[in-house]
């Protein structure tokens, strides 16, 4: 199969992480051709600086430099990564105005956070792209895919705008998938994600009229917040629809988060049985997506872990009421930047393979 022609709209935190995940998997210029990256600036020197120096993830494994597309331009507008040229394109208010067709881009990774509605994201298709992957929860009827859970539902003929869900849904859904697949069942559940701060938060107390607590300084506070991650699991695992809800606590760490799911099973079981089932899944049908640890680990130990969800058997609890055999707390870690970005790449590859197979039929 020819390299997948990809464009990244929005070269901020997640856009860059997705690009770095492509490089980390050894796909750049081989299986994936990143034709262009789009942002408000086209300053390739600044992009190269950001990619070379990452506070959390460190130095890249690839070479990166910036060059001019022609002597007439003021600043370098082309990234050269491992010898492969990537054009830096100026952002547009309307995705339909981006030159995807002219550039030969087939798959757009929409990572601005602005075009998460299906109708708005379809602007990329009007601009010449064939498919769009939104690196966030989407609205307006876009198909939501969580790799390892429901990717088989992707239809080349009908799914042109696809959401990769959220990083938290990508952590929670694999755990819930195993619990339901292995017949533990979920009668009801409450999820809390202890989530590292993100770029949308404030470094010092600032204005946030829609979310007063969200306007407080991120690096010195534990901030309660909302999340739709638990409810979104019902979109990819229909048997849990309406059974899960949750909230978030934003905490003063720059990366890595952890999901705490307290649930009631539909049958009697034990911690040992749950541990065994999840460990087996992590080694077999969920390998590479779900991990298992029985070590005494902390959040920093999961930086750059590309698995969506790493179950912590040391933190699993069972209600200690006499005779209670259905009430449990399970805990799973995730690098909310790195693992999620790898799943975006996996989803693009999966879609491209299915699309190619469909076109031959």
From Swiss-Prot:
SMART domains: Gp_dh_N. Gene3D superfamilies: Dihydrodipicolinate Reductase, domain 2, NAD(P)-binding Rossmann-like Domain. One of its GO terms (molecular function) is NADP binding. It is found in: Glycosome. The record marks 195 as: Activates thiol group during catalysis. The keyword Oxidoreductase applies. Its EC number is 1.2.1.12. The active site is at 167 (nucleophile). Its main location: other. One of its GO terms (biological process) is glucose metabolic process. Keywords: Glycolysis, Glycosome, NAD, Oxidoreductase, Peroxisome. Pathway: Carbohydrate degradation; glycolysis; pyruvate from D-glyceraldehyde 3-phosphate: step 1/5. A motif (Microbody targeting signal) lies at residues 359-361. NAD(+) binds at residues 13-14, 39, 92, 135, 336. D-glyceraldehyde 3-phosphate binds at residues 166-168, 198, 227-228, 250. It is an enzyme of class 1 (oxidoreductase). GO terms for cellular component: cytosol; glycosome. It catalyses: D-glyceraldehyde 3-phosphate + phosphate + NAD(+) = (2R)-3-phospho-glyceroyl phosphate + NADH + H(+). Homotetramer. Belongs to the glyceraldehyde-3-phosphate dehydrogenase family. This is Glyceraldehyde-3-phosphate dehydrogenase, glycosomal. It comes from Leishmania mexicana.
